[in-house]
Structures are given as structure tokens and as C-alpha cells.
């Protein structure tokens, strides 16, 4: 079998490491060696003590200050929110009161305007009725005059028509007085 020189060297290094490992195999890893347990425990206690002092003296006060500041800020914000709520409640109450007053005033104004309009309409209606009544009376007078005039003309027309009819039908001349008395007796 053919072996390269690089492979041969790596085998030599491996053999050397195995020999060195067997020399150290009898030794224990120092943190797990119970002979040194006391010193390990001592340094553990000192490390945790220093860590505890650091946390209790530096970190916890800072966290406490942050919590206190936050609590004060929340309390301040809650107080401010309460004041703003009270202000908003008073503003809403004032708004509702003024709105109710405005509505009642608007109702009074609307009623007054309605009454005023009713009075104006009633006055105009009376004026129009009076005007129409006057025009109706004037028209009745004119109709009566026209009717009387027409009736007067009807009488004279009836007289002339009766004279003509009698003359044509009977071929007799009748006096105007007799025809007039006959037309009056007929109601014309």
C-alpha cells in the first residue's frame, strides 16, 4: 500500500497526542476537584455578594426611580384627565342649557310669528271680503239698472212687436195706448 508523506506525518502527530493524553488522564478538571471546593465556594459567595450589592445599590434604585416617576406621571395624567372631564361636563351642561333656552325662544318667536301671520291673514281676508262685498253690491246695482233699462226697452220692443204682429196678422191698425196697456197687463 502506498502512503503519502502528509498522511504519515498526521499519524505521527496523532500518536504523540495520545501519549500526552495518557499522562494527563490522571488529573481532574480543577472546577470539579473537591480539594479546591472551599476556595470555589468562597469566590462564588463573594461574586454573588458583589453582584447583589451592585443590583441593590445601582439597578434597583434606578428602577425604583423610574417606577416612582411613572407613578407620579400617571397620577398627574389622571388628575388632569379628571379636571378636563369636569370642564367638559360643565361645558356640555352649559351648552345644553343654552340650547334649551334657544329652543324655547325659537318656540316663542315661532308662536308670535304664527299669531302675527294669522292676524295679517285674517285682516287681509276681511279686507278682501269687504272689497268683494262692495263689488258684489255694485255689480248687483248695475245688473238691476241694466235689467230695469232692458225691461223698459223690452216693454217698448214688445209694444212695437205686438203692433207689427197685429198689423201683419190681422191687417188692423191698433192704437199704441191699447197695445201698451196689453203689454203692461202681461207684465212687461
UniProtKB/Swiss-Prot annotation:
Record field: transmembrane: 35-55
Signal peptide: none
Topological relation to the membrane, as annotated: Single-pass membrane protein
GO MF, one annotated term: proton-transporting ATP synthase activity, rotational mechanism
Function per UniProt: F(1)F(0) ATP synthase produces ATP from ADP in the presence of a proton or sodium gradient. F-type ATPases consist of two structural domains, F(1) containing the extramembraneous catalytic core and F(0) containing the membrane proton channel, linked together by a central stalk and a peripheral stalk. During catalysis, ATP synthesis in the catalytic domain of F(1) is coupled via a rotary mechanism of the central stalk subunits to proton translocation. Component of the F(0) channel, it forms part of the peripheral stalk, linking F(1) to F(0).
Subunit note: F-type ATPases have 2 components, F(1) - the catalytic core - and F(0) - the membrane proton channel. F(1) has five subunits: alpha(3), beta(3), gamma(1), delta(1), epsilon(1). F(0) has three main subunits: a(1), b(2) and c(10-14). The alpha and beta chains form an alternating ring which encloses part of the gamma chain. F(1) is attached to F(0) by a central stalk formed by the gamma and epsilon chains, while a peripheral stalk is formed by the delta and b chains.
Recorded family membership: Belongs to the ATPase B chain family.
Name of the protein this chain belongs to: ATP synthase subunit b 1
Organism from which the protein derives: Bartonella quintana (strain Toulouse)
Source organism phylogeny: Bacteria, Pseudomonadati, Pseudomonadota, Alphaproteobacteria, Hyphomicrobiales
Amino acid at each position: 500500500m502506498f502512503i503519502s508523506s502528509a498522511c504519515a506525518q498526521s499519524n505521527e502527530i496523532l500518536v504523540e497526542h495520545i501519549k500526552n493524553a495518557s499522562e494527563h488522564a490522571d488529573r481532574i478538571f480543577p472546577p470539579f476537584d473537591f480539594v479546591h471546593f472551599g476556595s470555589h465556594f468562597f469566590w462564588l459567595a463573594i461574586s454573588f455578594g458583589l453582584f447583589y450589592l451592585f443590583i441593590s445599590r445601582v439597578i434597583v434604585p434606578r428602577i425604583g426611580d423610574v417606577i416612582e416617576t411613572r407613578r407620579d406621571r400617571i397620577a398627574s395624567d389622571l388628575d388632569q384627565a379628571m379636571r378636563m372631564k369636569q370642564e367638559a361636563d360643565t361645558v356640555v351642561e352649559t351648552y345644553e342649557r343654552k340650547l334649551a333656552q334657544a329652543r324655547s325662544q325659537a318656540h316663542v318667536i315661532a308662536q308670535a310669528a304664527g299669531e302675527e301671520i294669522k292676524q295679517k291673514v285674517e285682516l287681509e281676508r276681511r279686507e278682501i271680503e269687504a272689497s268683494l262685498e262692495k263689488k258684489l253690491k255694485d255689480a248687483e246695482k248695475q245688473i238691476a239698472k241694466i235689467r230695469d233699462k232692458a225691461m223698459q226697452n223690452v216693454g217698448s220692443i214688445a209694444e212695437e212687436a205686438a203692433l207689427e204682429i197685429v198689423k201683419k196678422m190681422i191687417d188692423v191698425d191698433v192704437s199704441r195706448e191699447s197695445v201698451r196697456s196689453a203689454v203692461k197687463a202681461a207684465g212687461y
